[in-house]
Amino acid sequence: MDTKYLFKRHNTYWVKVAVPKDLRKELGFDLRASLHTHELSEAQKLRDAVVEDFKSQIFAAKASLKNSNGKGAVKTFMPVTDTTDPQYYHKVVDCQYACPAHTPVPEYIRKISQGEYTEAYMINWESNVFPGILGRTCDRPCEPACRRTRTHEKPVAICRLKRVAADFKDDVTELLPKAPKETNGKKIALIGGGPASLTVARDLIVMGYECTLFEKDPQAGGLMRTNIPSFRLPEEVLDAEVDQILNMGLKTKFNSEITSLKNFLKEDFDAVFIGTGAPKGKDLNIEGRKDAEANIHIGIDFLTSIAFEHIDSIGKKVVVLGGGNTAMDCCRSSLRLGAEDVKVVVRSPFSQMKASEWEIEDAMEENIPILENHVPKKFLH
C-alpha cells in the first residue's frame, strides 16, 4: 500500500500533495487536506480521490498562469476556515501546536479538572518526559498562544498545571514502559546525560535497543541539574524524573568525559547520539577584564559551581551583567549565598529584557533592582 503521501497527526490522517515549483508562491509550500479518519485503508481510498481533484485544479491553475503571463488568479485549494464551527477548535489547538513537544494540553487539563492527576501526568510524560521539571522551569511557549488571552488578561496556567499533575499524582512506577526481555542486539551510545540523551534513551529502550549513557559529571540531568537553582527546581523532583528513565534499564557510565570522538567511534556501538548541549557562557571583554579576574564569574559556570557546592559564599556586593534567565538565576542565587547588595545591569530597556516575565517578577519580588539602559565600559576591580 502506498502511504508515501500520508501522515498521521493526533489520530487523523492527512494527505500531502506535491505542488509545482512555479505555483508554490500562490498555493503555499505545504498543500494538504485532512482526511478525518483513523483507518489507514480508508485514508488511502480518500487520498486517491483527493489527489485526482487536486490534479485537475493544479492543471487549471497552470493554464491560467500561462495564458495570463503568470498574473492570473489561482483558485483557492483549501476551503476557508469556518471558525463558527465548534469542531474547528477541537482540531486546531493553538497552545498544543505552540508547544515544541505538542503536548495535548486540553486532554491533560481536562483530567486535572476531574481530579485524575495520575492520568494527567502520564499524558504529559508521553510527550515531554519531564512534567514535574517543566512544570517549574518551562519557558511556556504555549501560554502566549492560549485563546483565553483573546477575552481575558492572562492565559490558562498551562505550565503550572503540569506541576499540579506531577505533585498530586500517585506512584507511576507500574505505568511506565519496561524494556523488553530480549533486545534487538543493537547498541547505542549516548554522550551527555542531559534531557536530550535521556529522552532518546526512553524512546529506544522500549524498542529493544541497548543504550549506554556517558556523562562527565557524577549524576545525570545535564544543565537541568547544574544550571537551574534548587530553589526553582528541587533536587528530589529532578532525581525522581531522571531516575524513571535510568531505571528502565539504561546503562550508565558517570565521571566519563569523552575527549576524542574519533577514538570513541571505534567502540562497539551501532550508533552514537551526541547530546552534550552547548554549556558555554558569554564573557565580556572590556577594559579591566583581566585585572578583575578574581572577582568575575561567568553566569552558567557560576551556577554550576553552586550546584556542585564549589561555591558556598560570595561577597556582600554583587553586580549581575545581563538581562536573560541566567542573569535572574544568578542574582537570586547571590542573595542566598549571603550577598546584601545585589543589582542587575542590562543594556536594553526594561521592556526588551530577554528573561521570562515571571523570572523578572521573581527577582523584583526579592527587592533586586534592575538598572536598564546601562552599558558596561570598564571593570574597576
What spans do the regions from the language model cover?
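Ferredoxin-type iron-sulfur electron-transfer modules and their immediate structural context
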Residues: 74-187, 235, 265, 274-293, ...
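Redox-cofactor binding/interface segments in oxidoreductases and associated redox assembly factors
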Residues: 272-275, 298, 320
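Feature captures the FAD/FMN-dependent oxidoreductase FAD-binding
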Residues: 182, 187-191, 239-286, 378-381
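Short, Arg/Lys-rich segments that mark the N-terminal edge of DNA/RNA- and chromatin-recognition modules
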Residues: 1-37, 62-74
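Extended interfacial segments that mediate partner engagement and assembly in macromolecular machines
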Residues: 168-209, 224
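Short arginine-rich
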Residues: 49-62, 130-135
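Rossmann-like dinucleotide-binding cores of NAD(P)H-dependent redox enzymes
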Residues: 210-213, 217-248, 252-253, 304-306, ...
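Rossmann-like dinucleotide/flavin-binding elements
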Residues: 189-214, 253-262, 280-283, 301-357
